[in-house]
Amino acid sequence: CIELNLLGGCYGYSVVHGGKKFCYLCYNEYETSQLDALLKFADEADLVIWDGMFTEAELETKRGWGHSSIEQGIFFSENCGHARVLISHHAPARLDNELHEIQKKLPDRVSLARDGLTLRL
């Protein structure tokens, strides 16, 4: 596991099974000082679940809430090798049509989690 940035504490974890690696990095208020440690933790991951509750613009007024942005998840995906990044933990007030518009703008290796999503690693 890896310690994440959340008031009160939180940990990210990874699971390796059948030669595949999955990392869960939610409830983390991402800071650039974490990048090297998170990249090392997610090294050789096939899938990373990323906390993307906010957009970068929304995050400006949500500092201290313990969540990251969609754009930070994209940045992480650009730096973490071949892993697919799944943005999760969406803002509760975000509407499905807003998520659909966000999804259309994401790079190929990044997508949004949704209810009922099943993935095969």
Map each language-model feature to its residues.
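Short beta-strand scaffold segments in enzyme catalytic cores
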Residues: 11-15, 119
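Short acidic/glycine-enriched loop/turn segments that link adjacent beta-strands
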Residues: 7-9
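Active-site donor-binding loop signature of nucleotide-sugar glycosyltransferases
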Residues: 4, 115, 121
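Conserved residues at beta->alpha junctions
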Residues: 3, 16, 89-90
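Residues in well-ordered beta-strands of folded domains
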Residues: 2, 14, 68
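Cap/insert and terminal regions of metallo-dependent hydrolase folds
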Residues: 21, 29-117
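Active-site-proximal beta-strand elements of phosphoester/diester hydrolases
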Residues: 1-5, 21-28
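Beta-strand-turn-beta hairpins that frame and shape the catalytic cleft
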Residues: 17-22, 121
